[in-house]
């Protein structure tokens, strides 16, 4: 589709993994995203999700799979602008879960088009690969993670036995990627997506509710949000959810090391400041 800017195109966001441009149009604003190779799957994935879930994914004007370009309509206001209200997640999470359930049918297609594979069966190997990297942790902490290797494999086996279908896992589901417009909540920025255990999506959501909103781990909101998210999946999944969050915390670290591998050396120090936080959250999950 051809669009004609009516003013200067401005850079809104420039990172090693993507550049985003603000494009003024006669009918409003569009957003152009050029993805780096590590996230080259995002334009096609976003377009496919929008085609199937137009009421919960931001509208795609067009995309170029070969060049990893994506053009989106203006999505509204991120809920971060309102302070990350838990009420927004209470409404959004069941709808996101329905999307995940529906996308389970398309897992093989997503994998074939480059969406990273973090299915539970491959996580033990991905964890071992993580530990082969030079990590921004002290020697004792790295040894704790290494010692945990056989236990992590056991936990993955336990989680797989619960029988939840693996599917799209956004892996960056926080207040800057959930937008409100016309009383609709839509998810965007699918560049961190993997095929993995669906429940692990809430690792990031819950982390930001703790860090940004200051909710303690035992706050009743976490139980309410968990139950709202699980409702489309069925009853009796509380224990499965807890196990998926534990395993998913390590899977999230594995996803981050994949991103880190594609960074230029000069960008790693800034990246590692957050990567260290993610690794420490994983360390906290090594205790039974």
Name each model feature, range by range:
Residues 10-26, 31-32, 60, 153-202:
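Active-site acidic catalytic loop and adjacent metal/ATP-binding pocket
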Residues 1-4, 105-115, 119-170, 181, ...:
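An alpha-helical support segment within catalytic cores of ATP-dependent transferases
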Residues 10-13, 17-118, 129:
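ATP-binding pocket architecture of kinase catalytic cores
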Residues 27, 71-85, 101-105, 125-136, ...:
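A glycine-centered beta->alpha junction motif in the catalytic cores
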